[in-house]
Amino acid sequence: MAALIADTGGLLRALAARPDGSATWPEYAKALMDASAVIVPALVLAEVDYFLGKNRSAMRKLVAEILDPHTTYELEHALPGDLARALEFDAKFAKLELGLVDGTVAAVAERRSVHRILTTDRRDFGALRIGVRFHRALTLLP
């Protein structure tokens, strides 16, 4: 088991459930369950809130789980250096049009040395490279 960083789409899919309670995207849910730590950047949490829209109960449940010290979730606030690095990623990989949230996911991955990303955005995170020389690829889950 290794830690992962949850991107917006990956987290939304991992949490999606059918009316009977079973996972809509079981491979995403399994990646969350198998992780030693699920790092959720605060900007990702804000984006998840936006996409959940009127599903307030789902957001309340997610926040409660993130704040529960007995879960594997870790809320990761963006440091000033993360925001600056996110803008560097956005400029370096301009054709991807990463934006601040995806750039911050990459910056947190780089700072925390956690290279496993739970995401639906294979195009951007598959092309992105982190590290001082932009040499390190990310491992995309599931």
Which residues make up each language-model segment?
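Short, well-structured N-terminal submotif of metal-dependent ribonuclease cores
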Residues: 1-40, 52-64, 131
